[in-house]
């Protein structure tokens, strides 16, 4: 399976990079993982609703340009469906079973995702009703994808 993570914003924190690199290495036994970092849109200090929409739309255009037409797109969004690790594993297994060899996870910037990106998404996934820093979400997502592969293979993984 080919897994892409399209994310807004450049990762700056060394500890996050190290964790992400570790999970990409672990996942290499199960899938090819590609992280596509896109620049965040510069925004004025006090954003109006219209300014927020413009920023999200510009970031959304960048995101959509990186999504393969045949990819199954999973947008990380607070309004998405919350799943257990086992449910995510089932979801990943179904994708592989039904011939979807490309899964693209999308992580928006600090303002979230544009309507166009949410519309393109085949599903919306939420990790919590809480908001997490978008840079940290990359690491959390990779850990859960790794856990999903381990579950699907019946391999041990700590709970």
UniProtKB/Swiss-Prot annotation:
E.C. numbers: 2.1.1.177
Cellular component terms (Gene Ontology): cytoplasm
Keyword check for rRNA processing: yes
Superkingdom to which the source organism belongs: Bacteria
Location (main, coarse): cytoplasm
Coiled-coil residue windows: none
CDD domains named in the record: RlmH-like (cd18081)
Binding residues for S-adenosyl-L-methionine: 76, 108, 127-132
Alphabetized UniProt keyword annotations: Cytoplasm, Methyltransferase, rRNA processing, S-adenosyl-L-methionine, Transferase
The keyword Mitochondrion is annotated on this UniProt entry: no
Reactions performed catalytically: pseudouridine(1915) in 23S rRNA + S-adenosyl-L-methionine = N(3)-methylpseudouridine(1915) in 23S rRNA + S-adenosyl-L-homocysteine + H(+)
Cited InterPro entries: Alpha/beta_knot_MTases, RlmH-like, tRNA_m1G_MTases_N
GO molecular function, a single term: rRNA (pseudouridine-N3-)-methyltransferase activity
Subcellular location as annotated: Cytoplasm
Homology family: Belongs to the RNA methyltransferase RlmH family.
Function: Specifically methylates the pseudouridine at position 1915 (m3Psi1915) in 23S rRNA.
Subunit relationships: Homodimer.
Protein name according to UniProt: Ribosomal RNA large subunit methyltransferase H
């Amino acid at each position: 399976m080919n897994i892409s993570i399209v994310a807004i914003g450049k990762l700056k924190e060394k500890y996050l990079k190290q964790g992400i690199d570790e999970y990409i290495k672990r996942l290499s036994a199960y899938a090819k993982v590609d992280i596509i970092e896109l620049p965040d849109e510069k925004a004025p200090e006090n954003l109006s609703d219209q300014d927020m929409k413009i920023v999200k739309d510009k970031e959304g255009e960048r995101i959509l340009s990186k999504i393969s037409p045949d990819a199954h797109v999973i947008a990380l969004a607070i309004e998405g469906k919350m799943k257990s690790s086992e449910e995510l594993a089932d979801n990943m297994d179904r994708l592989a079973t039904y011939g979807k060899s490309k899964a693209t996870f999308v992580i928006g910037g600090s303002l979230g995702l544009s309507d166009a990106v949410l519309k393109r998404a085949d599903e919306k996934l939420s990790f919590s009703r809480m908001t997490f820093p978008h840079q940290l979400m990359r690491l959390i997502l990779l850990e859960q994808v790794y856990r999903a592969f381990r579950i699907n293979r019946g391999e041990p993984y700590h709970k």
